[in-house]
Amino acid sequence: MTPAQCRAGRILAGLSQAELAEIAVIPATLITDYETGVGMPEPRDLAEIRSVLEWAGIEFVENERDGVGVRLRK
């Protein structure tokens, strides 16, 4: 999951950084820093962020031909 996918997925899911952090049980600054390119979360924190976004209905698109992105699960 790229920082852009994190931000787009969070917004598409209708979550603020604070809400995502609360559900993922991590500091909101980790999300802010990751989305802005300032920092990189530990692998376990990144996995938890992705898990919460997937729980919220986000699908991560990772395609060599079309690039990466996010979409709402049907």
Where are these regions (language model features)?
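Residues at secondary-structure transition points
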Residues: M1, M40, R44-A47, R65
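Mobile acidic interaction elements
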Residues: P3-C6, T32, E64
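Short basic helix-loop element that most often maps to the first helix and adjoining turn
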Residues: A4-E19
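Recognition helix of helix-turn-helix/homeodomain-like DNA-binding domains
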Residues: V25-P41
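DNA major-groove recognition helix of helix-turn-helix/homeodomain DNA-binding modules
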Residues: R44-V61
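Helix-turn-helix/homeodomain-like alpha-helical modules used for DNA recognition
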Residues: I58-K74
